[in-house]
UniProtKB/Swiss-Prot annotation:
Pathway: Cofactor biosynthesis; adenosylcobalamin biosynthesis; adenosylcobalamin from cob(II)yrinate a,c-diamide: step 7/7. This is Adenosylcobinamide-GDP ribazoletransferase. GO terms for molecular function: adenosylcobinamide-GDP ribazoletransferase activity; cobalamin 5'-phosphate synthase activity. Its main location: membrane. It catalyses: alpha-ribazole + adenosylcob(III)inamide-GDP = adenosylcob(III)alamin + GMP + H(+); alpha-ribazole 5'-phosphate + adenosylcob(III)inamide-GDP = adenosylcob(III)alamin 5'-phosphate + GMP + H(+). It is a multi-pass membrane protein. One of its GO terms (biological process) is cobalamin biosynthetic process. It holds the Pfam family CobS. The chain crosses the membrane at residues 3-23, 35-55, 63-83, 109-129, 135-155, 180-199, 200-219, 228-248. Its EC number is 2.7.8.26. It is found in: Cell membrane. Belongs to the CobS family. Joins adenosylcobinamide-GDP and alpha-ribazole to generate adenosylcobalamin (Ado-cobalamin). Also synthesizes adenosylcobalamin 5'-phosphate from adenosylcobinamide-GDP and alpha-ribazole 5'-phosphate.
Length: 248
């Protein structure tokens, strides 16, 4: 029952998909939702593929992919792309640790954040449009899964830069190897049915290696990770997955 609660909470937390159920979970148990982030990715990927099937005969491929990228942000309430923008505003402000974190918490968007947001959206559309038709189903399902697996990996290898404040901080302080192993198992099962294992394994190596590097870089700058920087990891790895599928 605890695991089912964690699954529902992870969907409620990571998406705007309405689930009219009030889940009562103790604060010291809420970290378990991290295990099910890849399930959220699979759900989002499935919805995006259905949207693709509905739109593909109505518009050009580029327009359809633009709709899909926009719809993905609607599904997630812009949570991850907002984190990416805040991360760039903070990291490229050339300020000290405390000021960087303060800038990230600021709801106002700066020039660096706008540039990161715009380029991320454009690159996602371009590489998604470049993926072969035969690989599109796999790309739309697996990319959101791998992105969220990478977030769990970052959580497992990092600490909170804000002393455990906020849900992101709580996850960073409490979730660890157990949650990553469960997330990895879920991701592997999902990926096994839609792409060759050798291709999936290589995508794991690329994505998790990048996640390790960027997590260490950010942690060196601000002493850990935050909810915003985890969102940035999600965005970068999803783009990496799109690039990977466009090359296959």
């Amino acid at each position: 029952m605890e695991e089912l609660k964690a699954l529902i909470l992870s969907i409620q937390f990571m998406t705007g998909i309405p689930i009219p159920i009030n889940i009562d979970v103790k604060e010291d148990k809420i970290y378990k939702i991290a295990s099910y982030f890849p399930v959220v990715g699979l759900l989002i990927g499935g919805i995006l593929y259905i949207a693709y099937l509905l739109l593909k005969d109505l518009f050009s491929r580029e327009i359809v992919m633009t709709f899909l990228v926009a719809f993905s942000y609607i599904l997630t309430r812009g949570m991850h792309i907002d984190g990416l923008a805040d991360t760039f505003d903070g990291l490229f402000s050339n300020k000290d640790r405390e000021k960087i974190i303060e800038i990230m918490k600021d709801s106002r968007l700066g020039t660096n954040g706008v540039l990161a947001l715009v380029f991320m959206v454009i690159l996602k559309i371009l590489f998604l449009s470049d993926i072969r038709q035969s690989l599109l189903f796999s790309a739309l399902l697996v990319s959101p899964v791998i992105a969220r697996l990478s977030v769990v990996f970052s959580i497992a290898i990092s600490k909170s830069a804000r002393g455990g404040k906020g849900l992101g901080g709580l996850l960073l302080e409490r979730a660890g190897l157990r949650e990553f192993v469960i997330a990895l198992l879920i991701s592997t099962i999902a990926g096994y049915f839609v792409m060759p294992l050798k291709d999936l394994a290589l995508l794991y190596v690329i994505s998790l290696s990048f996640t390790c590097l960027i997590s260490k870089y950010i942690s060196k700058k601000i002493g850990g990770m935050t909810g915003d920087t985890l969102g940035a990891v999600n965005e970068f790895v999803e783009l990496i997955a799109f690039i990977y599928f466009s090359i296959l």
